[in-house]
Amino acid sequence: MHDPVDTYMNLVPMVVEQTSRGERAYDIFSRLLKERIVFVNGPVHDGMSQLVVAQLLHLEAENPSKEISMYINSPGGVVTSGLSIYDTMQYIKPKVSTLVVGQAASMGSLLLTAGEKGMRFSLPNSRIMVHQPSGGYQGQATDIMIHAQETQKLKDRLNQIYVKHTGQPLKKVVDALERDNFMDAEQAKEWGLIDEIVESRANEDTSK
């Protein structure tokens, strides 16, 4: 029996556009991609990250000087998958504006704060959460030690990324990420994860 939630999530709305050659149908995400809007929606994993990276590279090739808007609603996920999106955001020429819609937790919060300085936004009721990467590898003692060392390296790297984009001192970042740390939009702004809280497009436009 199909889960009705899964069925709903797999239903992607279609939009019809009138062109000189007649009507053309797009799925809603492809239509928004034409407007240079990229969605980071749901858990961050390899499949999702490769789609986001491909969209960013496509938009850069299309126009390297025009801003890209990234909408984020994510509980986080695989660290390396999130870092592939992060690195691409820093690598491409277009400025990337970020906006959290709903939640930006774990790697979602890192992608949110990685947007262009002054162009990182939150809707008023969004939630943001930061924490350290989790381990949990099982196996031989030596392998467990190797994976523990790798987790520590990732933790140190993520700390440095948050320091870079928030302007917070390293000790404050380390302390904040020690446990799940939930913030509302105002707290995220005070912490430097975002630049502005927007309630309407008019507010967003005046913030730029």
From Swiss-Prot:
GO molecular function, one term: ATP-dependent peptidase activity
Keyword tRNA processing included in the entry's annotation: no
Enzyme Commission identifier(s): 3.4.21.92
Major site of localization recorded for this protein: cytoplasm
Function: Cleaves peptides in various proteins in a process that requires ATP hydrolysis. Has a chymotrypsin-like activity. Plays a major role in the degradation of misfolded proteins.
UniProt family annotation: Belongs to the peptidase S14 family.
Protein name: ATP-dependent Clp protease proteolytic subunit
